[in-house]
Amino acid sequence: MLLSSFGVAFADGDAANLFKTHCQGCHGADGGRVPASGIEPIKGQSDADLLKKLEGYKDGSFGAQRKLVMENVVKQLSDEQLKSLADYASTL
């Protein structure tokens, strides 16, 4: 159980770093920026909605303009990282 607690704390920090590294450039530090593609901002979306979209970009079932940009980003991330990222981004 102790390791589990540390894992959660690490995941939170890791998710913030993932967001900063992979998302902030287009979506802004607070997730409120509308990217050039005109899609809705991340800010204010639920973790479930964000995860569904991230998984859709990864498997090719979601996306419109700039789809290739997002596909290239999420292909680098594990399913666990996508979940952590969605959880973190939903708090913005």
Sequence positions of predicted segments:
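Residue-level hotspots at or immediately adjacent to binding/recognition sites across diverse folds
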Residues: A11, A29, K67
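Gly/Gly-Pro-rich "capping" loops immediately C-terminal to redox-active cysteine motifs
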Residues: A16, G28-D59, E71-N72
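C-terminal capping alpha-helices of c-type cytochrome domains
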Residues: N72-L92
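Conserved donor-nucleotide binding/catalytic region of nucleotide-linked donor-dependent transferases
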Residues: F62-Q65
